[in-house]
Amino acid sequence: MLETITSVNGVVNGIVWGPVGLALLFGTGFVMSVRTGFFQFGHFRYWLRNTIGAIFTDRDITAHTEKNDKAISQFQSLCTALAATIGTGNIVGVATAILSGGPGAIFWMWAMAILGMMTNYSENVLGIFYRRKNADGEWSGGAMYYLADGLGGKKGCKKLGRVLAVLFACFCVLASFGIGNMSQINSIAGNMNAAFQVPNLLTGILLAVLSALVILGGLKRVAAVTEKIVPLMALFYILGALTVVLTHVTAIPAAFAAIFKGAFAMQAAGGGVLGYGVSRAITWGFKRGAFSNEAGLGSSVMVHASSNVKEPVQQGMWGIFEVFADTIVVCTLTALVILTSGFVDLNTGRMLTEVQGSALVGEAFSTVFGSFGPKFIAVSILLFAYSTVLGWSHYGTKAFEYLFGTKASMGYKVVFVAMVLVGATMKLDLAWDLSDTFNGLMMLPNLIGVLSLSGTVAAITRNYVDRKFHGKQVEPMWSAFAEYQKEEEAEEATLDKAANE
């Protein structure tokens, strides 16, 4: 039975993460970039200023909503999304990309991220535009909703949209137990045991208790925790990585040269031959880029849709920043730590060590921090992976809610917390492989939805640009549903009146 599951999983994984799936992912990013006028480049300063740049100047970005308001702040939605996105892939995934595809894989990781910015942007725009309020008055949005109401609203596509929405939700629930829970906890337990000799069972018990205290409290409690953890863990890792890279500052030019040479087959990947090397660099760069920032999976939109924002484009810009922070900043720093620490021959791209995964990154940190290097990585993985569990708990909850209703979601949360203990104490090689596949299966219906609604994304973007950049007096496109559009307009009119008094 186990062999059959492994065999079937291998075939499906080869399709969703093979040339077809990766081409669809890359193509969607390119199409959405074209349809939005390459918004990520043309309005770079604008989206940077109105996202991370506004945190200290615009109280609306960080202000907590009132107790009876089920929405969360824009900053909380970013932190919860980044909590789920910045995980072991930013450490282990980058090391795997370099080991398997050579330094050139990093270039293609960047390429995927640059286009992925607009895929993530589009998901968030559609997430806000098609979101609805559930029985508890909480915003519910995500790929399920824009597949069912957006794609399903097109002529002759009603049944297709609903079927794809259900499939997406099912795959999301299954993925949440794997990549969003057990696999992450397993990484934490293994690294804590290796670095600090903490028993796996003890790690599992402690994390299960902490998870119960946070996750069972609902989205607001999850968001309240992630908005504190994410900035601290990012600062902790970035400062540590910068210390290593700047200590080896003379190797930085050679590291970038190796990345560009490897990307275009001017050197072999992992001891391979020229030509074959560039194919591996592209494949591993694309795969690890997708795993790292999750653009195209339709996952983070489920928390972004809960934000107290009216403008779909505003939340879309947070999606751009999310990919930028995850891949362009954090993953690049991990790559430079490895490439500047002497474990890769920068002239040939060949590995000079047989150490792999997080151990490779730990060894790279050890060149500066000595025996504390592996401990630094263990703590980083603890923070990164545990925050991923918190973020994915919300994704799974929303998908389960879509399938079975709001009242059933508490049952899902209880099972999710119980799986933390399972993840800490069991060998999970197959779980990693299965969760990998379920992520890919989430991606396919989501990208079909994004591409089919590309015209809607383009129209919403034009509407925003016309109003904000050109001062045109046109009706805003805030919601696909008249009742929510009127509700938002009435609230905006009240705020304008109060501001003018």
What are these regions (language model features)?
Residues 1-84, 88, 98-105, 116, ...:
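N-terminal alpha-helical transmembrane segments of multi-pass membrane transport
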Residues 4-5, 35-40, 89-94, 176-189, ...:
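Transmembrane helix-loop junctions in multi-pass membrane proteins
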Residues 24-49, 164, 168, 185-192, ...:
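Membrane-interface loop-to-helix entry segments
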Residues 32-33, 112-137, 148-186, 190-214, ...:
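Helix-loop-helix module between adjacent transmembrane segments
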Residues 38-72, 96-98, 102-106, 110, ...:
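Flexible loop linkers connecting adjacent transmembrane helices
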Residues 59-98, 126-129, 135-151, 173, ...:
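Alpha-helical membrane segments and immediately flanking helix-loop junctions
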Residues 62, 67-71, 102-111, 149, ...:
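Membrane-interface alpha-helices at helix entry/exit sites of multi-pass transporters
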Residues 123-136, 242-258, 266, 270-273, ...:
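Extracellular/periplasmic helix-exit of transmembrane alpha-helices
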